[in-house]
Amino acid sequence: MSNYTEVIQGHTLEYFDDEHQYIVDGICVPSITQILAVKFGHKYSGVSDKVLQNAAIRGTAVHKAIEDYCINGTESDLQELRNFKFLQKQYEFEVLENETPVILFKNNKPISAGRLDLVLKYKNKIVGADIKCTAKLDREYAAYQLNLYKIAYRQCYGVDWQLLRVVYLKGDKRKFAQVPINETGAWELIEEDGRFPD
């Protein structure tokens, strides 16, 4: 990912990759991932920095390969891309968007931002999806994350998703896993965060 500036719903969203920092209308806002840390903050405690760094590098490579394939048809030797293509053929989903920037609002005030991995069309439904390359698929984490993105995407683009899916790719493992829609739980997580008073 690289630095970018987008205008969404009249708000200027800037992203600075080196710091992983989002700025909306000149004000720093946490990423959706940082909001998730309220509930899942110690998710990787006990995992060495080296392992985390290698996993991050691999995850970035997988995301980039899928983005390049979806946008330009660029092929790659990554097994995860082959598995993505298998899932796409098996489930007959169409990629409508990838790496879509969003702003999350509370009471019309920007409180967070992020980039959504995929918007899909599947069985004539619009689906928000996230690519996961973790050692184990954490459906609870993915559900909170995708519900926050669901709210933000609707606020930014006026489109409501009917399903949430995880495209899980880890080595030879592949899943197109559904996670539940629970916007109430997502809003409760925002309240639990405490940084966003009414």
Where is each model-derived feature located?
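Metal-dependent nuclease catalytic cores that hydrolyze phosphodiester bonds in DNA/RNA
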Residues: 1-113
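Mg2+/Mn2+-dependent nuclease catalytic core
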Residues: 100-197
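C-terminal end-of-chain micro-motif
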Residues: 1, 197-198
